[in-house]
Amino acid sequence: MVDRKRNSSVISDNEENGRVDKKTKIKDEIEGDEVERDVKNEEANGADTDDKEEVRKDNEEENAENGGGEGDDDDDDDDEAEEEKKRTTTFNFDGVTYSFKERPSVLEEKEGKIEFRVVNNDNTKESLMVLTGLKNIFQKQLPKMPREYISRLVYDRSHLSMAVVRKPLTVVGGITYRPFDNREFAEIVFCAISSTEQVRGYGAHLMNHLKDYCRATSNVKYFLTYADNYAIGYFKKQGFNKEITLDKSVWMGYIKDYEGGTLMQCSMLPPILRYLDSAKILLLQKAAIEKKIKLRSKAHVVRPGLQVFKTNKDAKLNPAKDIPGLAESGWSEEMDKLAQKPKRGPHYNFMVTLLSELTNHPSAWPFSTPVNKEEVGDYYDVIKEPMDLSTMESKLENDKYDSFDQFLYDARLIFNNCRSYNADSTTYFKNATKLEKFMNNKIKDSAEYSHFLDQ
């Protein structure tokens, strides 16, 4: 590093008088630069102001031509309506018109914007480009999978891939799978859609294409795949489940086993049904069921509302006679009274809670089930009215307790029976006393039920 202080000290007085002071020169240069910069900034600001004024005037003129900008909103609404119209498919079944909305991916395919290609490593330029696009998507969407492993399987000639390609040649997503024709199943190795394209239904539409293609071109009837926790939901929607019905001898040792993955299976439908027509097929099934229901029921009939209340708000009606269609539906006053009757008694909730706490108490184990006659031969000779917690639970569930008094009687019966049969030095006697004390404290803590202890 240069020592500036030392260098400046060796300069002679004559040299200082014979040259321009460096500090003064630098200061003048800085001030000159600042003045020049300020001038340039003012000019630039003036130019910006002029430009902004011109843009503002242009915008005002454009808005005036478009009706103040409201025309843009109208155009957007028209575009949305047109999009909805394109997505809606209608058909007629038995004189009734039905409609359903197609996925955006289906619409894009119909318009020729995307296509579904089946590719493998055949060394052609276009196939390799598609496979490379798939490889990049898999590596990005499956970060826990080794990149080299993904590359090896995607380019492997024993594997096939179905890719979603946006024209001319942009890969959006795809599935790489390995078919085992002689064993009638295929293993789905990778399945992913680009993160920017996951809201248009590409995943479901891709799987439907793959199923139809495999059934039409091979003997494959089943799909097997290992799904991670994030993919299980997707595969369930596509007809996969965790129950593997395919015999282990068919697939064991043939598919790749992934640690932490969940093995899932899809059994495909008969070839007479196209998966790509699944939305229409489901709607046809619904229409057929509704037709059968209409033959047996009048629930679909819409009757006019009652007009009597418009003139007389306090009018009294005979429901069966004055309300059209009510009697035909099978309604009766008895049914109405039965429906309004509470299913449980007013004390049910408290009794359920109290019985649950008694059952879970550490001292309750001797009273959980009836006394075994084979273990205690003379018990039922001494105790004429036996009771236990499981019997109380059964009676409570079957609405045998009309009042809390009856419930409390059975609970006390358990403790009294125990103390009558067992000596006061036994564990059974002590447990009965502990559990009864616990029950009394619980009842005492309830303001609504504490008075039962005084009875």
From Swiss-Prot:
Compositional bias (Basic and acidic residues): 16-29
GO biological process, one term: transcription initiation-coupled chromatin remodeling
Key words of the record: Activator, Acyltransferase, Bromodomain, Chromatin regulator, Nucleus, Transcription, Transcription regulation, Transferase
Principal location listed in the UniProt entry: nucleus
SUPFAM superfamilies according to UniProt: Acyl-CoA N-acyltransferases (Nat) (SSF55729), Bromodomain (SSF47370)
GO cellular component terms given for this protein: nucleus; SAGA complex
Active site: E187
PROSITE patterns the record matches: BROMODOMAIN_1, BROMODOMAIN_2, GNAT
Every N-acetyltransferase domain range: 114-269
InterPro entries linked to this entry: Acyl_CoA_acyltransferase (IPR016181), Bromodomain (IPR001487), Bromodomain-like_sf (IPR036427), Bromodomain_CS (IPR018359), GCN5 (IPR037800), GNAT_dom (IPR000182)
Presence of keyword Lipoprotein: no
Biased composition (Acidic residues): 60-82
Binding locations of acetyl-CoA: C191, A192, I193, Q198, V199, R200, G201, Y202, G203, A204, Y230, A231, I232, G233
CDD domains in alphabetical order: Bromo_gcn5_like, NAT_SF
Region Disordered, residue ranges: 1-88
The organism's place on the tree of life at top rank: Eukaryota
Stored SMART domains: BROMO
Top EC class for this record: transferase
Disulfide-bonded cysteines: none
Assigned EC number: 2.3.1.48, 2.3.1.-
Acyltransferase in keyword set: yes
Family assignment from sequence similarity: Belongs to the acetyltransferase family. GCN5 subfamily.
Function: Histone acetyltransferase that acetylates histone H2B to form H2BK11ac and H2BK16ac, histone H3 to form H3K14ac, with a lower preference histone H4 to form H4K8ac and H4K16ac, and contributes to H2A.Z acetylation. Acetylation of histones gives a specific tag for epigenetic transcription activation. In addition to histone acetyltransferase, can use different acyl-CoA substrates, such as (2E)-butenoyl-CoA (crotonyl-CoA) and is able to mediate histone crotonylation.
Protein name, as recorded: Histone acetyltransferase GCN5
Name of the encoding gene: GCN5
